[in-house]
Amino acid sequence: MLRIADKTFDSHLFTGTGKFASSQLMVEAIRASGSQLVTLAMKRVDLRQHNDAILAPLIEAGVTLLPNTSGAKTAEEAIFAAQLALEALGTHWLKLEIHPDARWLLPDPIETLKAAEALVKQGFVVLPYCGADPVLCKRLEEVGCAAVMPLGAPIGSNQGLETKAMLEIIIQQATVPVVVDAGIGVPSHAAQALEMGADAVLVNTAIAVADDPVMMATAFRLAVEAGLLARQAVPGNRSTYASATSPLTGFLEALA
């Protein structure tokens, strides 16, 4: 069970809604993933119409919606987008994204911290997408963010946990949930994140662009479950030397 702010989730896999070939395929993949928290970009939906092609199927699916501010380049733009989302969807939950460079889509740490502090004061449940910077993540936690969402690699790159060393520090020092977001390309990346101690992962591109998104969503669900079980089982310590699983000489002594 994963608790963030006032909500609890059985699934430790969060999903996105971009890049799917159709809304029907999107919903089928989300259902196969078991995800209960789904993020969607405010810039991609018609907030005035709940029968929007993306929004309506998600509402019908009964998942918790996590609007995001993707496309915002400044704290002011992100705050404005958050207020629009609150008015349209009636949720204080928000994935805060501010990335001014469209080529790399890396989060702006200064604007993110500035916006997070303001939004928390306005009553939002803020989940900020941020760089894998332990100092920044601690600052975001201190201003009241409900979780932190450090990147594993650039958005949509499928590179995996390129920031592993920094993620380990973030996980070790965090007192709020850590959700690894961005760059996760295959299910083994997700399993590794959970094994490391991450509370959840958010996956979009890797599922949406697969030849079979529904099958890939299922694979991610199983990988996240496996990673969590492995962590709970407490793996053995890593060793420099070999350690035999059975006596090396006992059978020889028995023959003597």
Swiss-Prot record:
Name the Pfam families on file.
ThiG
Known function: Catalyzes the rearrangement of 1-deoxy-D-xylulose 5-phosphate (DXP) to produce the thiazole phosphate moiety of thiamine. Sulfur is provided by the thiocarboxylate moiety of the carrier protein ThiS. In vitro, sulfur can be provided by H(2)S.
State the family it belongs to: Belongs to the ThiG family.
Enzymatic reactions: [ThiS sulfur-carrier protein]-C-terminal-Gly-aminoethanethioate + 2-iminoacetate + 1-deoxy-D-xylulose 5-phosphate = [ThiS sulfur-carrier protein]-C-terminal Gly-Gly + 2-[(2R,5Z)-2-carboxy-4-methylthiazol-5(2H)-ylidene]ethyl phosphate + 2 H2O + H(+)
Q: Which GO terms describe its biological process?
A: thiamine diphosphate biosynthetic process
Entry-linked InterPro entries: Aldolase_TIM (IPR013785), Thiazole_synthase_ThiG (IPR033983), ThiG (IPR008867)
Under Gene3D superfamilies, the record lists: Aldolase class I
Q: Which residues bind 1-deoxy-D-xylulose 5-phosphate?
A: G156, A182, G183, N204, T205
So which domain of life are we looking at?
Bacteria
Q: In which pathway does it act?
A: Cofactor biosynthesis; thiamine diphosphate biosynthesis
The answer, when asked if GTP-binding is one of the entry's keywords, is no
EC number, UniProt record: 2.8.1.10
Can you name this protein? Thiazole synthase
Give the GO molecular function terms: thiazole synthase activity
Its localization reads:
Cytoplasm
The record's GO CC annotations read: cytoplasm
